[in-house]
Amino acid sequence: MKLTAIFPLLFTAVGYCAAQSIADLAAANLSTEDSKSAQLISADSSDDASDSSVESVDAASSDVSGSSVESVDVSGSSLESVDVSGSSLESVDDSSEDSEEEELRILSSKKSGSYYSYGTKKSGSYSGYSTKKSASRRILSSKKSGSYSGYSTKKSGSRRILSSKKSGSYSGSKGSKRRILSSKKSGSYSGSKGSKRRNLSSKKSGSYSGSKGSKRRILSSKKSGSYSGSKGSKRRNLSSKKSGSYSGSKGSKRRILSGGLRGSM
């Protein structure tokens, strides 16, 4: 009788222990799976973070390198201005200058009479440079205003071609026009590449094309010479008794001397 009463209690205890162990195992399995999935999710998120960081680094480096390449390309146009500095325009003695008029005098000789014209790739501007000792002439076209400036040293007299109602206006941008009006016969200048400039001191004066390798002829008489604007070319301004007169800006004069002969242009 006692044994028959104990058997149900034993079966009940064994069943409870088995159920509890099964529940514990299931909970342990669920926790391990959750931790593994969490690790996988965190690993995926870390991979995404590493990918995004790599992309951001690549984008920054590409942007920086691209801008540096562009800046190198922009500064590459300054090589021509370095080459331009080799030219020289020697000035005349101060004793022969007029005190009331602004003059620019250029002697034509093998050493000092060389003149170079360059057109940059971006603006097609025309630039003439000379050494520090000589009467320097700089024709600069800036990006903002496209202004024209002619400068010379104090010793050789200054020449400034200003844009006003009387002397004509100049715009440094491509295709713009500059008019230097000394008389009714004076010509026009277009700053774009391949345009023409006419300096008319008489009916026989020639034309000028601002592009590289073009030719400029400043004819004051039948004996005057020719000028080629390409690199390394020379300019000969030959004056004689029959040369004409030229007014560059407000009443100012430019004299181009060749040896003992003097003419005004």
UniProtKB/Swiss-Prot annotation:
The modification N6,N6,N6-trimethyl-5-hydroxylysine is found at K174, K193, K212, K231, K250. Transmembrane segments: none annotated. Due to its ability to synthesize simple silica nanospheres in vitro from silanes at nearly neutral pH and at ambient temperatures and pressures, it is of great interest in nanotechnology. May be of practical use for the fabrication of photonic devices. R repeats lie at residues 108-140, 141-162, 163-181, 182-200, 201-219, 220-238, 239-257. Keywords: Biomineralization, Cleavage on pair of basic residues, Hydroxylation, Methylation, Phosphoprotein, Repeat, Signal. The results of the mass spectrometry differ for the same peptide due to the length of the methyl-propylamine chains that vary from 14 to 18 units for the Silaffin-1A2 peptide (141-158) and from 13 to 17 units for the Silaffin-1A1 peptide (163-177). This is Silaffin-1. It comes from Cylindrotheca fusiformis. The gene is SIL1.
